[in-house]
Amino acid sequence: MINMIILVVFALIGLVVGYSAISIKLSKAKEQAETILLKAEQDAVNLRSQAEHDADHLRVTAERESKAQRKELLLEAKEKARKYREDIEEEFKSERQELKQMENRLTERATSLDRKDENLSSKELALEKKEQSLADKSKHLNEREENVTQLEAEKQAELERIGQMTIAEAREVILTETENNLTHEIATRIKDAEAQIKDTVDKKAKNLLAQAMQRLSGDYVTEQTVTTVHLPDDNMKGRIIGREGRNIRTLESLTGIDVIIDDTPEVVVLSGFDPIRREIARMTLEALIKDGRIHPARIEELVEKSRKEMDNRIREYGEEAAYEIGAMNLHPDLIKIMGRLQFRTSYGQNVLRHSVEVGKLAGIMASELGENVALARRAGFLHDMGKAIDKEVEGSHVEIGTEFARKYKEHPVVVNAIASHHGDVEPESVIAVIVAAADALSSARPGARNESVENYVKRLRDLEEIASSFDGVQTSFALQAGREIRIMVHPNKISDDEVTILSHKIREQIEKNLDYPGNIKVTVIREFRAVDYAK
Protein backbone atom coordinates (compact mmCIF):
# COMPACT_ATOMS: atom_id res chain seq x y z
CA MET A 1 0.00 0.00 0.00
CA ILE A 2 2.78 2.30 0.96
CA ASN A 3 4.57 1.37 -2.22
CA MET A 4 1.50 2.31 -4.20
CA ILE A 5 1.34 5.64 -2.50
CA ILE A 6 5.01 6.24 -3.14
CA LEU A 7 4.55 5.34 -6.80
CA VAL A 8 1.63 7.69 -7.06
CA VAL A 9 3.63 10.45 -5.40
CA PHE A 10 6.55 9.90 -7.76
CA ALA A 11 4.18 9.81 -10.66
CA LEU A 12 2.68 13.15 -9.61
CA ILE A 13 6.14 14.59 -9.11
CA GLY A 14 7.10 13.38 -12.57
CA LEU A 15 4.00 14.97 -14.03
CA VAL A 16 4.75 18.26 -12.30
CA VAL A 17 8.37 18.20 -13.42
CA GLY A 18 7.34 17.30 -16.98
CA TYR A 19 4.73 20.07 -17.06
CA SER A 20 7.31 22.55 -15.82
CA ALA A 21 9.78 21.43 -18.46
CA ILE A 22 7.13 21.66 -21.12
CA SER A 23 6.16 25.19 -19.89
CA ILE A 24 9.78 26.30 -20.02
CA LYS A 25 10.16 24.91 -23.54
CA LEU A 26 6.92 26.63 -24.59
CA SER A 27 8.15 29.97 -23.19
CA LYS A 28 11.47 29.63 -25.00
CA ALA A 29 9.64 28.68 -28.18
CA LYS A 30 7.38 31.71 -27.79
CA GLU A 31 10.37 34.01 -27.27
CA GLN A 32 12.11 32.52 -30.30
CA ALA A 33 8.93 32.98 -32.33
CA GLU A 34 8.64 36.63 -31.23
CA THR A 35 12.33 37.22 -32.05
CA ILE A 36 11.85 35.67 -35.47
CA LEU A 37 8.71 37.79 -35.99
CA LEU A 38 10.52 41.03 -35.02
CA LYS A 39 13.42 40.15 -37.27
CA ALA A 40 10.99 39.40 -40.09
CA GLU A 41 9.26 42.75 -39.56
CA GLN A 42 12.64 44.57 -39.51
CA ASP A 43 13.67 42.75 -42.66
CA ALA A 44 10.37 43.75 -44.24
CA VAL A 45 10.95 47.42 -43.29
CA ASN A 46 14.49 47.27 -44.65
CA LEU A 47 13.29 45.64 -47.82
CA ARG A 48 10.57 48.32 -48.21
CA SER A 49 13.11 51.14 -47.64
CA GLN A 50 15.50 49.55 -50.08
CA ALA A 51 12.69 49.15 -52.59
CA GLU A 52 11.63 52.79 -52.16
CA HIS A 53 15.25 53.94 -52.48
CA ASP A 54 15.70 51.85 -55.59
CA ALA A 55 12.43 53.20 -56.99
CA ASP A 56 13.48 56.81 -56.27
CA HIS A 57 16.85 56.16 -57.85
CA LEU A 58 15.19 54.68 -60.91
CA ARG A 59 12.74 57.63 -61.09
CA VAL A 60 15.54 60.23 -60.78
CA THR A 61 17.59 58.36 -63.36
CA ALA A 62 14.59 58.19 -65.68
CA GLU A 63 13.83 61.90 -65.19
CA ARG A 64 17.48 62.82 -65.81
CA GLU A 65 17.55 60.74 -68.95
CA SER A 66 14.20 62.23 -70.01
CA LYS A 67 15.48 65.77 -69.42
CA ALA A 68 18.66 65.02 -71.30
CA GLN A 69 16.63 63.65 -74.20
CA ARG A 70 14.30 66.67 -74.12
CA LYS A 71 17.26 69.03 -73.98
CA GLU A 72 18.92 67.22 -76.85
CA LEU A 73 15.69 67.33 -78.88
CA LEU A 74 15.22 71.02 -77.99
CA LEU A 75 18.77 71.86 -79.04
CA GLU A 76 18.28 69.91 -82.24
CA ALA A 77 15.01 71.77 -82.91
CA LYS A 78 16.66 75.12 -82.15
CA GLU A 79 19.54 74.28 -84.47
CA LYS A 80 17.09 73.38 -87.24
CA ALA A 81 15.13 76.59 -86.60
CA ARG A 82 18.35 78.61 -86.66
CA LYS A 83 19.44 77.06 -89.93
CA TYR A 84 15.98 77.61 -91.39
CA ARG A 85 16.00 81.24 -90.22
CA GLU A 86 19.47 81.75 -91.67
CA ASP A 87 18.35 80.29 -94.98
CA ILE A 88 15.28 82.52 -95.02
CA GLU A 89 17.34 85.56 -94.03
CA GLU A 90 19.87 84.77 -96.75
CA GLU A 91 17.06 84.59 -99.30
CA PHE A 92 15.59 87.86 -98.00
CA LYS A 93 19.06 89.42 -98.05
CA SER A 94 19.61 88.50 -101.67
CA GLU A 95 16.14 89.75 -102.59
CA ARG A 96 16.76 93.00 -100.69
CA GLN A 97 20.05 93.44 -102.50
CA GLU A 98 18.32 92.98 -105.83
CA LEU A 99 15.61 95.44 -104.82
CA LYS A 100 18.29 97.87 -103.58
CA GLN A 101 20.13 97.61 -106.89
CA MET A 102 16.90 98.23 -108.80
CA GLU A 103 16.13 101.17 -106.52
CA ASN A 104 19.63 102.59 -107.06
CA ARG A 105 19.26 102.28 -110.83
CA LEU A 106 15.87 104.00 -110.71
CA THR A 107 17.30 106.70 -108.43
CA GLU A 108 20.21 107.29 -110.80
CA ARG A 109 17.85 107.58 -113.75
CA ALA A 110 15.62 109.97 -111.82
CA THR A 111 18.67 112.00 -110.76
CA SER A 112 19.88 112.14 -114.34
CA LEU A 113 16.47 113.31 -115.54
CA ASP A 114 16.32 115.91 -112.75
CA ARG A 115 19.80 117.13 -113.67
CA LYS A 116 18.80 117.50 -117.31
CA ASP A 117 15.62 119.29 -116.26
CA GLU A 118 17.64 121.64 -114.04
CA ASN A 119 20.08 122.34 -116.87
CA LEU A 120 17.22 123.22 -119.20
CA SER A 121 15.63 125.40 -116.51
CA SER A 122 18.97 127.11 -115.84
CA LYS A 123 19.49 127.83 -119.51
CA GLU A 124 15.96 129.17 -119.82
CA LEU A 125 16.46 131.41 -116.77
CA ALA A 126 19.80 132.61 -118.15
CA LEU A 127 18.16 133.57 -121.45
CA GLU A 128 15.37 135.39 -119.61
CA LYS A 129 17.93 137.24 -117.47
CA LYS A 130 19.91 138.26 -120.56
CA GLU A 131 16.76 139.53 -122.25
CA GLN A 132 15.79 141.43 -119.11
CA SER A 133 19.34 142.80 -118.78
CA LEU A 134 19.34 144.01 -122.38
CA ALA A 135 15.93 145.62 -121.86
CA ASP A 136 17.15 147.31 -118.66
CA LYS A 137 20.31 148.55 -120.38
CA SER A 138 18.29 149.93 -123.26
CA LYS A 139 15.94 151.67 -120.85
CA HIS A 140 18.90 153.01 -118.84
CA LEU A 141 20.57 154.35 -121.99
CA ASN A 142 17.36 156.11 -123.00
CA GLU A 143 17.08 157.63 -119.51
CA ARG A 144 20.73 158.76 -119.60
CA GLU A 145 20.23 160.27 -123.02
CA GLU A 146 17.25 162.22 -121.72
CA ASN A 147 19.23 163.27 -118.64
CA VAL A 148 22.16 164.45 -120.80
CA THR A 149 19.82 166.50 -122.94
CA GLN A 150 18.22 168.00 -119.84
CA LEU A 151 21.62 168.71 -118.25
CA GLU A 152 22.83 170.41 -121.42
CA ALA A 153 19.79 172.65 -121.35
CA GLU A 154 20.30 173.38 -117.62
CA LYS A 155 24.00 174.13 -118.10
CA GLN A 156 23.23 176.42 -121.01
CA ALA A 157 20.72 178.30 -118.87
CA GLU A 158 23.18 178.37 -115.96
CA LEU A 159 25.95 179.77 -118.17
CA GLU A 160 23.62 182.46 -119.46
CA ARG A 161 22.69 183.32 -115.84
CA ILE A 162 26.33 183.31 -114.65
CA GLY A 163 27.31 185.58 -117.50
CA GLN A 164 25.03 188.24 -116.02
CA MET A 165 26.42 187.81 -112.38
CA THR A 166 29.02 189.80 -110.49
CA ILE A 167 32.18 188.15 -109.03
CA ALA A 168 30.65 188.01 -105.52
CA GLU A 169 27.48 186.39 -106.78
CA ALA A 170 29.45 183.80 -108.80
CA ARG A 171 31.60 183.00 -105.72
CA GLU A 172 28.43 182.46 -103.63
CA VAL A 173 26.95 180.12 -106.23
CA ILE A 174 30.16 178.04 -106.40
CA LEU A 175 30.37 177.78 -102.59
CA THR A 176 26.71 176.74 -102.35
CA GLU A 177 27.13 174.00 -104.96
CA THR A 178 30.34 172.77 -103.28
CA GLU A 179 28.60 172.67 -99.89
CA ASN A 180 25.67 170.70 -101.33
CA ASN A 181 28.02 168.20 -102.97
CA LEU A 182 30.06 167.74 -99.77
CA THR A 183 26.90 167.35 -97.64
CA HIS A 184 25.64 164.59 -99.93
CA GLU A 185 29.02 162.83 -99.89
CA ILE A 186 29.29 163.04 -96.08
CA ALA A 187 25.75 161.68 -95.63
CA THR A 188 26.53 158.79 -97.99
CA ARG A 189 29.72 157.93 -96.12
CA ILE A 190 27.97 158.12 -92.74
CA LYS A 191 25.25 155.81 -94.02
CA ASP A 192 27.83 153.31 -95.33
CA ALA A 193 29.73 153.47 -92.03
CA GLU A 194 26.54 152.83 -90.03
CA ALA A 195 25.71 149.81 -92.20
CA GLN A 196 29.25 148.47 -91.81
CA ILE A 197 29.19 149.01 -88.02
CA LYS A 198 25.79 147.32 -87.74
CA ASP A 199 27.02 144.33 -89.74
CA THR A 200 30.15 144.07 -87.57
CA VAL A 201 28.14 144.37 -84.35
CA ASP A 202 25.70 141.67 -85.51
CA LYS A 203 28.57 139.31 -86.30
CA LYS A 204 30.25 139.95 -82.95
CA ALA A 205 26.95 139.48 -81.10
CA LYS A 206 26.33 136.17 -82.88
CA ASN A 207 29.86 135.02 -82.10
CA LEU A 208 29.40 136.03 -78.46
CA LEU A 209 26.13 134.10 -78.15
CA ALA A 210 27.63 131.08 -79.90
CA GLN A 211 30.60 131.07 -77.52
CA ALA A 212 28.30 131.37 -74.50
CA MET A 213 26.13 128.47 -75.68
CA GLN A 214 29.14 126.29 -76.47
CA ARG A 215 30.69 126.88 -73.05
CA LEU A 216 27.53 125.93 -71.16
CA SER A 217 26.34 122.35 -70.81
CA GLY A 218 23.35 121.36 -68.68
CA ASP A 219 21.18 118.29 -68.13
CA TYR A 220 17.44 118.80 -68.23
CA VAL A 221 14.39 116.58 -67.93
CA THR A 222 10.94 117.81 -68.87
CA GLU A 223 8.81 118.10 -65.75
CA GLN A 224 5.78 115.84 -65.63
CA THR A 225 2.52 116.02 -63.67
CA VAL A 226 2.63 112.50 -62.22
CA THR A 227 4.83 110.72 -59.67
CA THR A 228 5.02 106.97 -59.07
CA VAL A 229 5.50 105.34 -55.67
CA HIS A 230 6.69 101.73 -55.57
CA LEU A 231 5.05 99.36 -53.09
CA PRO A 232 6.62 96.32 -51.36
CA ASP A 233 3.67 94.18 -52.53
CA ASP A 234 0.17 94.54 -53.98
CA ASN A 235 -1.46 93.89 -50.60
CA MET A 236 -0.38 97.39 -49.59
CA LYS A 237 -2.86 98.86 -52.11
CA GLY A 238 -5.81 97.68 -50.02
CA ARG A 239 -4.32 99.20 -46.88
CA ILE A 240 -3.74 102.51 -48.66
CA ILE A 241 -7.37 102.58 -49.81
CA GLY A 242 -8.63 101.69 -46.32
CA ARG A 243 -12.05 100.63 -45.15
CA GLU A 244 -14.65 102.12 -47.52
CA GLY A 245 -11.86 104.26 -49.02
CA ARG A 246 -11.37 106.46 -45.94
CA ASN A 247 -7.54 106.41 -46.07
CA ILE A 248 -7.23 107.39 -49.73
CA ARG A 249 -9.92 110.10 -49.32
CA THR A 250 -8.06 111.57 -46.34
CA LEU A 251 -4.76 111.63 -48.24
CA GLU A 252 -6.36 113.27 -51.30
CA SER A 253 -8.20 115.87 -49.19
CA LEU A 254 -5.11 116.87 -47.21
CA THR A 255 -2.67 117.03 -50.14
CA GLY A 256 -4.93 117.97 -53.08
CA ILE A 257 -3.40 115.17 -55.18
CA ASP A 258 -5.15 112.36 -57.07
CA VAL A 259 -4.04 108.95 -55.77
CA ILE A 260 -4.47 106.54 -58.70
CA ILE A 261 -4.46 102.82 -57.86
CA ASP A 262 -4.91 100.56 -60.88
CA ASP A 263 -3.81 97.11 -62.06
CA THR A 264 -0.16 98.11 -62.41
CA PRO A 265 1.73 95.76 -60.07
CA GLU A 266 3.33 97.29 -56.97
CA VAL A 267 2.89 100.90 -58.14
CA VAL A 268 0.70 103.81 -57.01
CA VAL A 269 0.48 106.93 -59.20
CA LEU A 270 0.20 110.44 -57.71
CA SER A 271 -1.28 112.93 -60.18
CA GLY A 272 -1.38 116.70 -59.71
CA PHE A 273 -0.18 119.86 -61.44
CA ASP A 274 1.41 121.39 -58.31
CA PRO A 275 4.88 119.80 -57.80
CA ILE A 276 5.06 120.81 -54.12
CA ARG A 277 1.76 119.13 -53.28
CA ARG A 278 2.78 116.09 -55.31
CA GLU A 279 6.11 115.84 -53.48
CA ILE A 280 4.40 116.17 -50.07
CA ALA A 281 1.98 113.39 -51.06
CA ARG A 282 4.90 111.19 -52.17
CA MET A 283 6.83 111.76 -48.94
CA THR A 284 3.71 111.06 -46.87
CA LEU A 285 2.84 107.87 -48.75
CA GLU A 286 6.39 106.52 -48.52
CA ALA A 287 6.46 107.30 -44.79
CA LEU A 288 3.12 105.51 -44.31
CA ILE A 289 4.39 102.44 -46.18
CA LYS A 290 7.57 102.37 -44.10
CA ASP A 291 5.71 102.96 -40.81
CA GLY A 292 2.97 100.40 -41.50
CA ARG A 293 0.30 102.30 -39.53
CA ILE A 294 -2.11 103.58 -42.16
CA HIS A 295 -5.22 105.32 -40.84
CA PRO A 296 -6.65 108.87 -41.13
CA ALA A 297 -5.09 110.20 -37.91
CA ARG A 298 -1.64 108.92 -38.86
CA ILE A 299 -2.06 110.31 -42.38
CA GLU A 300 -2.80 113.80 -40.99
CA GLU A 301 0.25 113.59 -38.71
CA LEU A 302 2.61 112.54 -41.52
CA VAL A 303 1.23 115.13 -43.97
CA GLU A 304 2.06 117.87 -41.46
CA LYS A 305 5.51 116.36 -40.90
CA SER A 306 6.11 116.17 -44.66
CA ARG A 307 5.18 119.86 -45.02
CA LYS A 308 7.84 120.79 -42.45
CA GLU A 309 10.40 118.57 -44.19
CA MET A 310 9.47 120.20 -47.50
CA ASP A 311 10.33 123.64 -46.07
CA ASN A 312 13.81 122.37 -45.17
CA ARG A 313 14.27 120.79 -48.61
CA ILE A 314 13.21 124.03 -50.32
CA ARG A 315 15.86 125.94 -48.38
CA GLU A 316 18.47 123.30 -49.28
CA TYR A 317 17.58 123.54 -52.99
CA GLY A 318 17.99 127.32 -52.82
CA GLU A 319 21.35 127.08 -51.05
CA GLU A 320 22.69 124.50 -53.55
CA ALA A 321 21.62 126.61 -56.53
CA ALA A 322 23.09 129.80 -55.01
CA TYR A 323 26.37 128.00 -54.33
CA GLU A 324 26.42 126.60 -57.89
CA ILE A 325 25.92 130.06 -59.44
CA GLY A 326 28.26 131.79 -56.97
CA ALA A 327 25.63 134.20 -55.58
CA MET A 328 27.06 134.93 -52.14
CA ASN A 329 25.45 136.74 -49.18
CA LEU A 330 21.89 136.23 -50.41
CA HIS A 331 19.21 137.05 -47.87
CA PRO A 332 17.78 133.83 -46.29
CA ASP A 333 14.30 134.74 -47.54
CA LEU A 334 15.61 135.06 -51.10
CA ILE A 335 17.30 131.65 -50.78
CA LYS A 336 13.99 130.11 -49.72
CA ILE A 337 12.16 131.86 -52.58
CA MET A 338 14.70 130.52 -55.08
CA GLY A 339 14.39 127.03 -53.58
CA ARG A 340 10.64 127.08 -54.26
CA LEU A 341 11.42 127.46 -57.96
CA GLN A 342 12.62 123.82 -57.92
CA PHE A 343 8.92 122.96 -57.73
CA ARG A 344 7.76 125.52 -60.29
CA THR A 345 7.66 124.96 -64.04
CA SER A 346 7.24 127.31 -66.98
CA TYR A 347 5.99 125.58 -70.12
CA GLY A 348 7.36 122.31 -68.72
CA GLN A 349 10.82 123.81 -67.94
CA ASN A 350 12.07 123.70 -64.34
CA VAL A 351 12.36 127.38 -63.33
CA LEU A 352 15.23 126.89 -60.85
CA ARG A 353 17.38 125.09 -63.43
CA HIS A 354 16.37 127.76 -65.96
CA SER A 355 17.50 130.48 -63.52
CA VAL A 356 20.85 128.77 -62.95
CA GLU A 357 21.32 128.42 -66.71
CA VAL A 358 20.50 132.11 -67.29
CA GLY A 359 22.98 133.09 -64.57
CA LYS A 360 25.75 131.02 -66.16
CA LEU A 361 25.02 132.34 -69.67
CA ALA A 362 24.94 135.93 -68.38
CA GLY A 363 28.29 135.40 -66.63
CA ILE A 364 29.90 134.02 -69.80
CA MET A 365 28.65 136.92 -71.94
CA ALA A 366 29.66 139.46 -69.29
CA SER A 367 33.21 138.06 -69.23
CA GLU A 368 33.44 138.38 -73.02
CA LEU A 369 32.23 142.00 -72.86
CA GLY A 370 34.39 143.00 -69.89
CA GLU A 371 31.44 143.51 -67.50
CA ASN A 372 31.11 142.48 -63.84
CA VAL A 373 30.75 138.67 -64.08
CA ALA A 374 29.57 138.10 -60.48
CA LEU A 375 26.89 140.79 -60.78
CA ALA A 376 25.70 139.41 -64.14
CA ARG A 377 25.46 135.86 -62.74
CA ARG A 378 23.55 137.14 -59.70
CA ALA A 379 21.10 139.15 -61.84
CA GLY A 380 20.52 136.21 -64.19
CA PHE A 381 19.99 133.86 -61.25
CA LEU A 382 17.40 136.12 -59.58
CA HIS A 383 15.58 137.34 -62.72
CA ASP A 384 12.59 134.94 -62.38
CA MET A 385 12.28 134.76 -58.59
CA GLY A 386 8.83 136.39 -58.75
CA LYS A 387 7.45 133.17 -60.23
CA ALA A 388 7.88 131.47 -56.84
CA ILE A 389 5.22 133.68 -55.23
CA ASP A 390 3.13 134.95 -58.15
CA LYS A 391 0.15 132.90 -56.91
CA GLU A 392 0.29 134.48 -53.45
CA VAL A 393 0.99 138.13 -54.32
CA GLU A 394 -0.83 140.36 -56.79
CA GLY A 395 1.07 141.37 -59.90
CA SER A 396 3.22 139.83 -62.61
CA HIS A 397 6.33 137.85 -61.72
CA VAL A 398 8.46 140.75 -63.02
CA GLU A 399 6.79 143.26 -60.69
CA ILE A 400 6.95 140.88 -57.72
CA GLY A 401 10.60 140.03 -58.35
CA THR A 402 11.55 143.70 -58.68
CA GLU A 403 9.74 144.58 -55.45
CA PHE A 404 11.43 141.79 -53.47
CA ALA A 405 14.86 142.66 -54.90
CA ARG A 406 14.42 146.24 -53.66
CA LYS A 407 13.07 144.99 -50.31
CA TYR A 408 16.16 142.88 -49.67
CA LYS A 409 18.61 145.62 -50.77
CA GLU A 410 19.88 144.02 -53.97
CA HIS A 411 22.21 146.02 -56.25
CA PRO A 412 20.36 148.57 -58.48
CA VAL A 413 21.77 146.83 -61.57
CA VAL A 414 20.19 143.55 -60.41
CA VAL A 415 16.87 145.29 -59.72
CA ASN A 416 16.83 146.89 -63.18
CA ALA A 417 17.81 143.58 -64.84
CA ILE A 418 14.84 141.85 -63.17
CA ALA A 419 12.48 144.68 -64.11
CA SER A 420 13.60 144.90 -67.74
CA HIS A 421 14.18 141.28 -68.77
CA HIS A 422 10.72 141.15 -70.44
CA GLY A 423 10.90 144.68 -71.86
CA ASP A 424 8.49 146.22 -69.31
CA VAL A 425 11.03 148.98 -68.56
CA GLU A 426 14.11 150.22 -70.38
CA PRO A 427 17.42 148.51 -69.48
CA GLU A 428 19.79 150.91 -67.74
CA SER A 429 22.97 148.82 -68.01
CA VAL A 430 24.75 146.37 -70.27
CA ILE A 431 24.15 143.63 -67.68
CA ALA A 432 20.38 144.13 -67.96
CA VAL A 433 20.60 143.57 -71.73
CA ILE A 434 22.82 140.51 -71.16
CA VAL A 435 20.28 138.99 -68.74
CA ALA A 436 17.44 139.50 -71.24
CA ALA A 437 19.51 137.82 -73.97
CA ALA A 438 20.46 134.91 -71.67
CA ASP A 439 16.81 134.46 -70.68
CA ALA A 440 15.79 134.30 -74.34
CA LEU A 441 18.57 131.79 -75.09
CA SER A 442 17.59 129.46 -72.24
CA SER A 443 13.84 129.53 -72.83
CA ALA A 444 13.69 129.63 -76.64
CA ARG A 445 16.06 126.77 -77.45
CA PRO A 446 14.36 123.72 -79.04
CA GLY A 447 12.90 121.31 -76.51
CA ALA A 448 13.23 123.62 -73.51
CA ARG A 449 9.53 124.29 -73.13
CA ASN A 450 6.22 122.59 -73.81
CA GLU A 451 3.28 124.90 -74.38
CA SER A 452 0.56 122.23 -74.07
CA VAL A 453 1.70 121.32 -70.53
CA GLU A 454 1.75 124.99 -69.51
CA ASN A 455 -1.78 125.54 -70.86
CA TYR A 456 -3.02 122.53 -68.90
CA VAL A 457 -1.39 123.74 -65.67
CA LYS A 458 -2.72 127.29 -66.21
CA ARG A 459 -6.28 125.98 -66.64
CA LEU A 460 -6.06 124.10 -63.33
CA ARG A 461 -4.57 127.13 -61.55
CA ASP A 462 -7.34 129.37 -62.87
CA LEU A 463 -9.88 126.84 -61.59
CA GLU A 464 -8.35 126.90 -58.10
CA GLU A 465 -8.09 130.71 -58.10
CA ILE A 466 -11.82 131.05 -58.87
CA ALA A 467 -12.72 128.74 -55.99
CA SER A 468 -10.29 130.42 -53.56
CA SER A 469 -11.62 133.92 -54.37
CA PHE A 470 -14.80 133.38 -52.29
CA ASP A 471 -14.92 134.38 -48.61
CA GLY A 472 -14.71 131.51 -46.17
CA VAL A 473 -12.72 129.23 -48.47
CA GLN A 474 -9.70 127.71 -46.72
CA THR A 475 -8.09 125.74 -49.56
CA SER A 476 -9.11 124.42 -52.96
CA PHE A 477 -7.70 121.55 -54.98
CA ALA A 478 -8.22 120.78 -58.68
CA LEU A 479 -8.42 117.00 -59.07
CA GLN A 480 -9.01 114.44 -61.83
CA ALA A 481 -7.17 116.54 -64.44
CA GLY A 482 -9.53 119.45 -63.81
CA ARG A 483 -12.76 117.45 -63.87
CA GLU A 484 -13.30 118.07 -60.14
CA ILE A 485 -12.65 121.02 -57.82
CA ARG A 486 -12.65 120.20 -54.10
CA ILE A 487 -13.06 123.17 -51.72
CA MET A 488 -12.35 123.10 -47.96
CA VAL A 489 -14.14 125.91 -46.05
CA HIS A 490 -13.70 127.43 -42.58
CA PRO A 491 -16.44 125.92 -40.37
CA ASN A 492 -16.64 129.14 -38.33
CA LYS A 493 -17.34 131.27 -41.43
CA ILE A 494 -19.54 128.97 -43.55
CA SER A 495 -22.56 127.16 -42.12
CA ASP A 496 -24.05 123.90 -43.39
CA ASP A 497 -26.83 125.82 -45.13
CA GLU A 498 -24.34 128.13 -46.86
CA VAL A 499 -22.30 125.22 -48.26
CA THR A 500 -24.86 124.47 -50.97
CA ILE A 501 -25.18 128.16 -51.87
CA LEU A 502 -21.38 128.48 -52.11
CA SER A 503 -21.13 125.47 -54.45
CA HIS A 504 -23.72 127.07 -56.77
CA LYS A 505 -21.86 130.40 -56.78
CA ILE A 506 -18.55 128.72 -57.59
CA ARG A 507 -20.21 126.73 -60.38
CA GLU A 508 -21.62 129.93 -61.90
CA GLN A 509 -18.21 131.65 -61.80
CA ILE A 510 -16.53 128.65 -63.44
CA GLU A 511 -19.13 128.57 -66.22
CA LYS A 512 -18.75 132.31 -66.73
CA ASN A 513 -14.95 132.63 -66.75
CA LEU A 514 -13.51 129.32 -67.98
CA ASP A 515 -13.62 127.32 -71.21
CA TYR A 516 -13.39 123.60 -70.54
CA PRO A 517 -14.47 120.29 -72.09
CA GLY A 518 -17.12 118.14 -70.40
CA ASN A 519 -18.29 118.79 -66.84
CA ILE A 520 -16.54 119.95 -63.67
CA LYS A 521 -17.68 118.51 -60.35
CA VAL A 522 -17.75 121.14 -57.56
CA THR A 523 -17.40 119.60 -54.08
CA VAL A 524 -17.53 121.84 -50.99
CA ILE A 525 -16.42 120.21 -47.71
CA ARG A 526 -17.16 121.67 -44.28
CA GLU A 527 -15.45 119.81 -41.43
CA PHE A 528 -15.92 120.81 -37.80
CA ARG A 529 -13.84 119.31 -35.00
CA ALA A 530 -14.24 119.71 -31.25
CA VAL A 531 -11.12 118.68 -29.28
CA ASP A 532 -10.74 118.58 -25.51
CA TYR A 533 -8.34 116.87 -23.10
CA ALA A 534 -9.25 114.87 -19.99
CA LYS A 535 -6.90 115.60 -17.07
UniProtKB/Swiss-Prot annotation:
Matching PROSITE patterns: HD, KH_TYPE_1
Which PANTHER family would you find in this protein's record? RIBONUCLEASE Y
Q: What is this protein called?
A: Ribonuclease Y
Q: What class of enzyme is it?
A: hydrolase
Compartments (UniProt record): Cell membrane
What ranges does the record give for the region Disordered, renumbered to this chain?
A: 103-149
Q: What InterPro entries does the record tag this protein with?
A: HD/PDEase_dom, HD_domain, HDIG_dom, KH_dom, KH_dom_type_1, KH_dom_type_1_sf, Ribonuclease_Y, RNase_Y_N
Q: What is its EC number?
A: 3.1.-.-
Task: Name the Gene Ontology molecular function terms of this record.
Answer: RNA binding; RNA endonuclease activity
Its GO CC terms are:
plasma membrane
Q: Membrane topology per the record?
A: Single-pass membrane protein
Q: State the UniProt keywords alphabetically.
A: Cell membrane, Endonuclease, Hydrolase, Membrane, Nuclease, RNA-binding, Transmembrane, Transmembrane helix
Q: Which organism is it from?
A: Streptococcus thermophilus (strain ATCC BAA-250 / LMG 18311)
| Superkingdom | Bacteria
Family that this chain belongs to: Belongs to the RNase Y family.
For this protein, the record's Pfam families field holds: HD, KH_1, RNase_Y_N
Described by its record, this protein's role is as follows:
Endoribonuclease that initiates mRNA decay.
Cysteines paired by S-S bonds: none
Enumerate the transmembrane spans: 4-24
Enumerate the spans annotated as KH domain.
225-285
Domain named HD: residues: 351-444
